[in-house]
Amino acid sequence: MSMQKMNRFHWHLTEDQGWRIEIKKHPKLTEIGSMRKETIINRYSAAIPGIYDGTPYGGFYTQEEIKEIVAYAKERYITIIPEVDLPGHMLAALATYPELGCTGGPYEVGTR
């Protein structure tokens, strides 16, 4: 980032396609919400059907890993701007806690 003279890192931690931050009071967010059944591998549009790889994907950052990354960035004068994208883009959270939705579900972690 420094080579490009950038000192702000916008860290997108939640999305329809996965919940990527450990919340210790809500472990199901990473047990369920961090996993998706497959990933789209082409450019998606209404005119082009999605092509998927069929490979489950998942992962998340632990609170300890996030602390390490924040410290690393701070040493390099990089400001991290975390984003938890709620109430929009909530499929990963709704797949975990469907009772929070207003349509009755069912919900699954997004793939596109």
Predicted stretch roles:
Residues 1-112:
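Substrate-binding cleft of carbohydrate-active enzyme catalytic domains
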